[in-house]
Amino acid sequence: GPYGQPINLAIDYLLANTQQSGFISAPRAASHGPMYGHGFSVLFLAECYGMSPRAELREALSRGVKLIVDTQNREGGWRYYPQRADADISVTVCQVMALRAARNAGLHVPKETIDRSIQYVKQCQNADGGFMYQLGGGPSAFARSAAAVVALNSAGLYDTPEIRKALDYLAQCLAKPAASQPYYEYGHYYAVQAMWQAGGEAWARWFPAVRDEMTRSQRDDGSWSASIDADYATAMHAIVLQVPNNVLPIFQR
């Protein structure tokens, strides 16, 4: 396709930064939470593998998946670094989505790993339907609650009491401007997937409002701004707005 070359360059970059352990991380670019980068890298490679079954791609994927499986902690989740320490729901969801994409691409993912991770996510749900950051208590918030719904969907849970409560919670966050929502782009990256899977009235209410808010905030040069980085913001907005096209396997109903 027209974007084959840049996608292959991105694949080459990730393969070059895959360590022997399977950990995908570029030391010079690593943040304080490199397991985020690892999870999203595995997700990206898994999506590419279905269209470009390069042998070295499968090898990196297999090692990346093994690292995720091997570093799951006793609670069933993951944290910022590839070690069995504590866990939080945000990093955990990132790994769950990577494992789901890898499984969809034909790689083996132990059922026990998925079951334990989903149990962790469920245990993080608050009475208001939203999700706390870590086990032990804490308030609900938009971004991590949207992420939690997507993780539950990935395990085949679509119409359960947990999902219904969570969707009701997310509906209260509808189309709030970026300035009033921490992690706005990250939250909407997951929220659009949650609402797309919910379909029906939930999707009919959510997407037009978010689409209109996002198109209004687009800058004249086609980009979006964010406190983190304009490239990141633009990529996230583009992903959100194209979900109804049903192109990427991980987003498909």
Question: Each predicted region: which residue ranges?
Answer:
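Eukaryotic helix-linker segments that join adjacent hydrophobic helices
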Residues: 11-18
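An alpha-helical repeat/solenoid feature that recognizes helix-turn-helix modules
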Residues: 1-6, 19-66, 70-115, 123-209, ...
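Predominantly the C-terminal beta-signal and adjacent terminal strand-loop region
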Residues: 215-219
